[in-house]
């Protein structure tokens, strides 16, 4: 039996983050365009070669200088009129779309399905026009590196329009126009003698109407005339449309067999067409735990009843974009944990090992096979994976969702203690992380006293600046934190932190998701010392800053041997202990950030309620012991909350800040009259280097007051300030305070 191997996509970042370094050096002017393109070409060469060592077929077109959705939009001429004509190869124009320029707002950014990757939302043009076949250019480059192994990847036209927030008849109308353009792209790629053309259509695993399906089917009936199309799905199953997909005249179908458990059953129940290839996503592209190879061997062998081996390609469940590059870059992980991990390069090795075992028998690869199984078992047998005291404490919670005193009764108690003005100003939490700060953190273990002095000096600096600017509710700036999840993970038992486990969040922004390897609990205070020190420097209230249980879960690689709801409850209890200690230290406002709350939603609405129930419960486990006079804040990112407003209200936070600056108030229009707690929608976009003017901020505040009474509105940036410079922060926050004073005067 001859099984081929591939993956849906591969990480862009590289070991040591050469991707990030090249981008940021180019943006800062330290690298010219020639040098930048040379650095990117070297990175692309290396990632192609790495894949070709293990795989039979290498995806090409998944790489991007910022975001693959943006690349597709530019290729199709979907450039907002405010930017004028942008040539597909013009780097300045390309990055202006992503980051804004000269007062022009960037494209809106939001979460890519239910992941922590961000994409730029396409704006529909008046007229579609194919600018350049950018994937064809990547294929020609790749064929010089890996030869016939190169196969192209396109973001499918139907999912592209769904990502642009089109639906129903409007989607069908635009899809007709795009189909002709995609047909040309497919023809040109097919002429390169590629094995097949992967068209990513992950939106099929969400809710799809009959009208939308008909538009999809018509598109692919046409595209299949022009090349060998494999419709690639991921992040779930396609069971509602499985039989219809099998009837399409496409070359093959890519299915997620990890998250999409029901896809296995669909194949077994309905069979699989003998004229198509199956790209079977059998290794996890989203989580880092080693595959259970023995189980996969049995399952894949069973697939041979339905799919001949020559038509079966072993692959990842989704793009490996969500994984770090390699476990071999880690030097300090406990062996009991590292033995159970598989990052992107290890996933390639798993696929190669599986294919060899299936082709020649396990005996042919016995030593490697046995070592892989033993490594996984070493983690399962590890100390700390199960902690009886933690299991007992979570069991004692029962099944009820804990509650505080009613919001209406808490408000006067909080105002009496805090005495805040109308339209109180604050920031979301983080302040710029300077080079000196990063250097001090890197040297912390060698010089802990010097590090503590640096942190306290930075906190004092941040407090003094905020007082100087006239901010009402202060933050300590989080100088001790490398990342809002990573910091807490490094101080909670059950978590382990990687050194080189970087994954792309958006553009050059990379994060290191920690790994939840065992039961989670707090062994000591997490943030009390820094917050209490900040409060000692000012009479204004300082917010305690914590990361909520759902975000701690969503932005981590979570153990796969315990339900996510159970892990979230464990984190909630650890945070409850921290809230109690912050109150005891005199902190009267505590913010528990949940920027990832919405991204945890399953992609089909029928599955939402179960998630929302346990997510709300985990948050309230963390907050329910807080005093009524303690004001609980939360913060959420890039989200459309209108359809989950009941769950947001059920969190029972006193104040919520949301990332709405790029959405022109559309979110608030849906919340009008449906949410009674206080809201800070974000008055400017921190992801853009553009500095808002006082006039722009006044206009934004007036817009917000069309939807919210002044008593309900808070004034703040739309996210943390960690990625900005102090010069940018000073200019923006001073303008924000000035604008707030003007609006207050107008109201009074």
Swiss-Prot record:
The positions annotated for binding Zn(2+) are 635, 637, 659, 719
Record's Pfam families? Meth_synt_1, Meth_synt_2
Q: Which InterPro entries match?
A: Cbl-indep_Met_Synth_N, Cobalamin-indep_Met_synthase, Met_Synth_C/arc, UROD/MetE-like_sf
Q: What positions does the entry give for L-homocysteine binding?
A: 428-430, 478, 593
Q: Which residues bind 5-methyltetrahydropteroyltri-L-glutamate?
A: 111, 509-510, 555, 599
Q: Which pathway or pathways does this protein act in?
A: Amino-acid biosynthesis; L-methionine biosynthesis via de novo pathway; L-methionine from L-homocysteine (MetE route): step 1/1
Q: What is the required cofactor set for this protein?
A: Zn(2+)
Residue positions annotated to bind L-methionine are: 428-430, 478, 593
Which catalytic residues are annotated? 687 (proton donor)
Q: What EC number(s) does this enzyme carry?
A: 2.1.1.14
Q: For this protein, what reaction is catalysed?
A: 5-methyltetrahydropteroyltri-L-glutamate + L-homocysteine = tetrahydropteroyltri-L-glutamate + L-methionine
The protein's superkingdom reads Bacteria
Known CDD domains for this protein?
Answer: CIMS_C_terminal_like (cd03311)
Cofactor remark from the record: Binds 1 zinc ion per subunit.
Its annotated function is as follows: Catalyzes the transfer of a methyl group from 5-methyltetrahydrofolate to homocysteine resulting in methionine formation.
In the record, the note on similarity to other proteins reads:
Belongs to the vitamin-B12 independent methionine synthase family.
PANTHER family named among the record's database cross-references: 5-METHYLTETRAHYDROPTEROYLTRIGLUTAMATE--HOMOCYSTEINE METHYLTRANSFERASE (PTHR30519)
- For this entry, the protein name equals 5-methyltetrahydropteroyltriglutamate--homocysteine methyltransferase
Q: Which organism is it from?
A: Herpetosiphon aurantiacus (strain ATCC 23779 / DSM 785 / 114-95)
């Amino acid at each position: 039996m001859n099984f081929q191997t591939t993956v849906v996509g591969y990480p862009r970042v590289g070991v040591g983050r050469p991707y990030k370094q090249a981008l940021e050096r180019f943006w800062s002017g330290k690298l010219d365009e020639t040098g930048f393109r040379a650095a990117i070409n070297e990175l692309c060469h290396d990632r192609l070669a790495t894949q070709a060592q293990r795989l039979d077929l290498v995806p090409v077109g998944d790489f991007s200088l910022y975001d693959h959705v943006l690349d597709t939009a530019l290729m199709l001429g979907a450039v907002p009129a405010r930017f004028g004509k942008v040539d597909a190869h013009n780097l300045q124009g390309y990055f202006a779309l992503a980051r804004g320029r000269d007062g022009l707002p960037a494209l809106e950014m939001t979460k890519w399905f239910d992941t922590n990757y961000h994409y730029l939302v396409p704006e529909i043009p008046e007229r579609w026009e194919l600018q350049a076949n950018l994937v064809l250019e990547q294929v020609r480059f790749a064929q010089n590196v890996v030869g016939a192994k190169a196969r192209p990847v396109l973001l499918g036209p139907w999912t592209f329009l769904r990502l642009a927030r089109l639906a129903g008849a409007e989607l069908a109308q635009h899809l007709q126009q795009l189909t002709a353009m995609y047909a040309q792209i497919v023809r040109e790629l097919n002429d390169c003698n590629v094995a097949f053309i992967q068209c990513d259509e992950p939106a099929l695993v969400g809710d799809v109407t009959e009208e939308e399906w008909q538009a999809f089917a018509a598109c692919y009936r046409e595209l299949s005339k022009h090349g060998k199309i494999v419709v690639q799905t991921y992040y779930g199953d396609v069971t509602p449309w499985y039989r219809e997909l099998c009837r399409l005249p496409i070359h093959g179908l890519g299915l997620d067999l990890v998250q999409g458990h029901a896809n296995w059953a669909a194949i077994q129940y309905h069979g699989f067409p003998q004229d198509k290839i199956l790209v079977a996503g059998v290794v996890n592209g989203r989580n880092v735990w080693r595959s259970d190879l023995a189980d996969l061997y049995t399952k894949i062998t069973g697939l041979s009843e339905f799919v001949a081996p020559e038509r079966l390609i072993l692959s990842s469940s989704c793009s490996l974009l969500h994984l770090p590059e390699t476990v071999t870059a880690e030097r300090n992980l406990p062996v009991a944990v590292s033995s159970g991990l598989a990052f992107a390069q290890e996933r390639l090795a798993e696929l190669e090992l599986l294919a060899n075992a299936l082709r020649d028998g396990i005996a042919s690869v016995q030593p490697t096979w046995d070592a892989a199984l033993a490594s996984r078992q070493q983690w399962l047998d590890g100390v700390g994976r199960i902690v009886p005291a933690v299991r007992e404490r979570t069991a004692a919670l029962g099944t009820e969702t804990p509650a505080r005193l009613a919001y209406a009764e808490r408000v006067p108690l909080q105002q009496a203690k805090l005495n805040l003005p109308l339209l109180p100003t604050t920031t979301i939490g983080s302040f710029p992380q300077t080079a000196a700060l990063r250097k001090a953190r890197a040297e912390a273990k060698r010089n802990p006293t010097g590090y503590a002095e640096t942190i306290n000096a930075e906190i004092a600096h941040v407090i003094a600046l905020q007082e100087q600017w006239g901010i009402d509710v202060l933050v300590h700036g989080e100088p001790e934190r490398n990342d809002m999840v990573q910091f807490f993970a490094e101080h909670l038992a059950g978590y382990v932190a990687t050194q080189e486990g970087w994954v792309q969040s958006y553009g050059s922004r990379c994060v290191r998701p920690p790994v939840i390897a065992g039961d989670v609990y707090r062994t000591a205070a997490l943030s009390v010392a820094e917050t209490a020190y900040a409060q000692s420097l000012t009479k204004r209230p300082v917010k305690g800053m914590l990361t909520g249980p759902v975000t701690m879960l969503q932005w981590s690689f979570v153990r796969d041997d315990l339900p996510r709801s159970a892990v979230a409850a464990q984190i909630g209890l650890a945070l409850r202990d921290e809230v109690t200690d912050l109150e005891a230290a005199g902190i009267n406002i505590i913010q528990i950030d949940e920027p990832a709350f919405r991204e945890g939603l399953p992609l089909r609405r029928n599955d939402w309620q179960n998630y929302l129930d346990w997510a709300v419960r985990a948050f309230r486990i963390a907050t329910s012991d807080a005093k009524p006079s303690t004001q609980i804040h939360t913060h959420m990112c890039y989200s459309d909350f209108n359809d989950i407003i009941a769950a947001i209200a059920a969190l029972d936070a006193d104040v919520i800040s949301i990332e709405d600056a790029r959405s022109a108030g559309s979110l608030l229009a849906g919340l009008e009259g449906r949410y009674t707690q206080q809201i800070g929608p974000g008055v400017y976009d921190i992801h853009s280097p553009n500095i808002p003017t006082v006039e722009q901020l006044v206009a934004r505040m007036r817009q917000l007051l069309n939807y919210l009474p002044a008593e309900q509105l808070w004034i703040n940036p739309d996210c943390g300030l960690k990625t900005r410079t102090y010069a940018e922060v000073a200019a923006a926050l001073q303008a924000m305070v000035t604008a707030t004073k003007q609006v207050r005067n107008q109201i009074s």
